[in-house]
Amino acid sequence: METIIEDCKALDYSWLPQQIEGFTLVVSNESDYTSLLERLTAGEEVLKVPIFHYQNDLGWRWCALYDKEVEDYTVHIEMPLFSFVDISFVRGDLESFWNGLKERCVKGLTNMLIEPSNNFTFTYRRRGIPTWDFSEVMPKELEGFVRDIDPAHGIRMINGSFIVGEYRKMDECSGLLLYYNELRDEYFAELRYKSYPEIDHHLDAKNLDDLANVLREHLGPILKGLNDRVD
């Protein structure tokens, strides 16, 4: 790990844009890398070496890093309620990873989080999800939760899944995630309560008409239930 940290520290970051459509660059500096080396010297386990990330005002992060658990250089998409790996960037060595970032970093971030419709598949479009009028059943704010992802701007993940809706409290990691999985051709939801995931079957649906019905009936009560919890 010492060699990996030193190699990352020596990288040329000058080509990275400071801003990409509302996302600001944050680069690991010498102090950050020194802190990682000190932790290793103290016998601590270091599982990730952050290299740089882009972050917007919603707390969405596009992160380039080394992941010791899989022994790969990779890109993690880190959102307030969920995270996943962009496997298209995974490389086993730093040189090819860095060259891949130079070629596709801006495009990768743009397609993933800024213009996510670029990642919509044929199935996602054929189901009519991007053009569906969700305004009645998915209001911008509900029970103190803010909708910051909607079906017209769904985030493509892995294994055929899209995040088509997210409601969250802006100051805490609680809320609701609405998914569409194109392999199973179904909609379903997960809850987050203080970062802990929970399955909720009230929003299970096979098509947009069914989804509209269950959202109309259950979305408000589900979010109210999260508000009413007492630890």
Residue ranges of predicted features:
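Negatively charged, low-complexity tracts enriched in Asp/Glu with abundant Ser/Thr
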Residues: 1-53, 107-172
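Short, isolated positions within intrinsically disordered regulatory regions of eukaryotic proteins
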Residues: 19, 64-66, 102, 136
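Polar/charged alpha-helical tracts
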Residues: 34-38, 96-99, 140, 144, ...
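Intrinsically disordered, low-complexity regulatory segments enriched in Ser/Thr/Pro
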Residues: 57-100, 170-213
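Short, structured interface segments
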Residues: 94-112
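Glycine-rich loops and low-complexity Gly/Arg-rich segments
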Residues: 100-101, 113-115, 189-190, 214-216, ...
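Short C-terminal domain-edge/linker segments immediately following a structured domain
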Residues: 105-108, 119-121, 195-196, 220-224
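Long, compositionally biased interface segments
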Residues: 202-231
